[in-house]
């Protein structure tokens, strides 16, 4: 059994499709947690992913070799400003109140740097061009097809996820064989 969570989901789908094409299914089942493999309905995050934005991100990452986690967190926060930006500006900055500790706040601040090569490929090939879902992605000369995956697959989507919208997760879940 193998698990893919968030960005690990497209990577898992890619791996399973690659193995299936080579008749090398090494796993009995796979679980995808809030993970997209079809980015057609990827939601508001697609507002930040067009040719101009991708060029800017690529140039930014070329300097340091990674995307700083704080930048990624800022983009995610901008997807839900009513919940993740404005309460802190009003309560903390304007009213001088201390933020209440809660698990989402801690989790949201725990960002990870994204290696440039990985992030560039992910944004361009998955989000922008949706190659895996369209059957246009190749890995090592092997054309990938999610429909060739024959092991049992479980997908979990959460109702209010602003990064992996449930409609996108559901659409991708239907692509497996």
Q: Each predicted region: which residue ranges?
A:
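Conserved alpha/beta-hydrolase "acid-adjacent" motif
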Residues: 162-168
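Glycine-rich nucleophile elbow surrounding the catalytic serine of serine-hydrolase chemistry
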Residues: 1-16
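Alpha/beta-hydrolase-fold enzymes
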Residues: 14-119
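Mobile cap/lid helix-loop segments that gate and shape the active-site cleft of serine hydrolases
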Residues: 108-144, 151-152
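Short beta-strand/loop motif that positions the catalytic acidic residue
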Residues: 149, 155-157, 161
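Catalytic histidine neighborhood in serine/cysteine hydrolases
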Residues: 123, 169-177
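Short, conserved loop/helix-junction motifs that constitute active-site signature segments
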Residues: 146-149, 175-177
